[in-house]
């Protein structure tokens, strides 16, 4: 059974069990409780099952027979009815995996000569700081977790994988999202990985609820991200920023144009242009940013500030245009990274 079928079947079964009439579950909180209870039973050595007899696995390889974290991400779209309106489009797993690998490889190449020793690479990966400015349900934060652990496992074969998972969760990955409901899913996925790796107590929260474009004293840049920025910034910025045009969103753009980010704004712009500029500002010297975005920015007059910043403040390592390939089923237009 394909992952999509597992997701659809679980939705149908869960709704039926919860409501008796196929209706929607009352809240994401209820589903989270069911999943966490299942995880805790498994940790205690008991067989835990989800409504409808489904298994719950933290391993994405089990997606053909179980509900996995990526299936939970797909469920998010069913719970958040305003996802399209907010510009949120959830990223397919194959793209997340590829982007995570490309970003880490590009960063390592810029930091270390080739050939490089395993000890040097392991040391760098142990200290890397990664940021997703629009976490959503945690596709990229989980993708980076898996990729960093896989690479470090090859370089440090004597280190138990659970130790590597806990180290990456505690030290390497940060994220921000303005949507509290979406962030709850991302935090839950981190919490599952933490517990499955033998983590004790609460995991330090590096996934922050807030507006990535809020530069005020009460915003995330002056609060949860301030220590990293004081130390020079992030090594990697990765993600899928919200695609929101000016049409029908005048208040949102007017507020942005009156903020400290006004220099990144222009007419006929898209919201993600400013996200990209802020992401570049968050990078440490020698850092790498990898975003998936609509490809029209290369010729759109409204993206002039972004193009100028790219040319003056940094360099382009790679552009990958997907052409007519529909990366996102629910989003119009062509995309690139």
Regions found by a protein language model. Give the residues of each.
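Class I S-adenosyl-L-methionine
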Residues: 1-174, 182, 211, 215-216, ...
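Signature of N6-adenine DNA methyltransferases within the class I
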Residues: 1, 5, 11, 139-142, ...
